[in-house]
Amino acid sequence: SFEGSQGSGTAALELTLDIPLLHARDTKVKGIVTLEENVLAMPWPVPPVTDLTGRVTFTEKGAWAERVTAKAFSRDATLNMHTEEDGTISLAFSGLAQPRSVSYFNNNPILAEALTHVKGETSYVGAVSISPATGVSVSVQSDLKGVSTDLPSPLNKSAGSVWPLTFAFSNAGSGKTARHRIAVNVARNRFSGIVEVPAEGSRVSPRGSFAVGRRTYLPRSGFALEITGKTLDADRWQTAGEALIAAAKKLAVTGDTEGGATLERVSVDLEE
């Protein structure tokens, strides 16, 4: 649903109501909202959009839209929307984004440090599902063309090279064990990361793992940093690794979670 959303701007509404005199609960609704450079802020994790322009049709059962244009993360985007039979709202979108936009979903110190070595912007396609049963999920794919890095091998990338990226945000658990899960994979495990953070009201501790040169998995607790490779530049990776480890040490948290989240494991594996 759009509960908790806030919007502003100029819009035109066409509305038709069919209200049975003896059965008002069976009222039928049909309408069209024409948006012109509107602003829409939905609850996290859906990013806010500006310059929202296009037509949205709706009934008592849901909403639909095609080729609505907007700006997300200050870059052009296009979206389509439809409502499933079970009430799930599905958004399909595409556009341009800068890598640092990922930090909107989780401003993890390790991820933030890694993103300081990345510049440029790239095209993407993605989907948002807003389900009455499972909440909000987000998935994004990109080839990262247009993005470059100044990290050591195997994470040194030129702007013209193609590195497939997948990003996923989902929910797990409920009540005091409810948590958000964020997973990123770049160029088939050149870099991978997975993080779980507590949802509002949850008492679970954050945990996660980031890996270079291999696929990573959620640890039982705390955070892990793994670097694997056949030909690692020891000097350059020492500098980069020290910065990542320093960032990881900022992960200690306070609050209502059970315990804290700290860097529990660092491994470097030079493959033969």
Give the positions of each predicted feature.
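Membrane-proximal interfacial segments on either side of biological membranes
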Residues: 1-71, 75-181, 194-272
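Central antiparallel beta-sheet cores of small beta-barrel/beta-sandwich binding domains
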Residues: 186-188
